[in-house]
């Protein structure tokens, strides 16, 4: 019975530790950064005649994008306002 209690406590500890890391700012920024670039590329597809992804030449900061939570319409205005 004592061994079972220790195993249960250990399992609960592992679950708590794994979920703590899932919600840290660094973890959220990492996930956001990966999806932000794909989302911006989908909203403002690059054109062959342009060197960058954005027609205005101003690529939005990924840090700002993730911390401010820009909407799709804001990204279109900042990045591809002529589309």
Swiss-Prot record:
UniProt keywords (A-Z) are:
Disulfide bond, Secreted, Signal
Main subcellular localization, coarse class?
secreted
Signal peptide residues on this chain, from the entry's feature table:
1-21
Q: What positions belong to coiled-coil segments?
A: none
- Please list the disulfide bridges: 32-66, 44-79, 54-80
TM spans (from-to): none
Give the subcellular location: Secreted
Recorded GO cellular component terms are: extracellular region
Indicate the family of this protein.
Belongs to the insulin family.
**What is the recorded name of this protein?**
Probable insulin-like peptide alpha-type 2
């Amino acid at each position: 019975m004592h061994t079972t209690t220790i195993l249960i406590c250990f399992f609960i500890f592992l679950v708590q530790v794994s979920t703590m890391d899932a919600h840290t700012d660094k973890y959220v920024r990492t996930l956001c950064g990966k999806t932000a670039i794909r989302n911006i590329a989908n909203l403002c597809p690059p054109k062959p005649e342009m060197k960058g992804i954005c027609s205005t030449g101003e690529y939005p900061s990924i840090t700002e994008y993730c911390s401010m939570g820009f909407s799709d319409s804001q990204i279109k205005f900042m990045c591809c306002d002529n589309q």
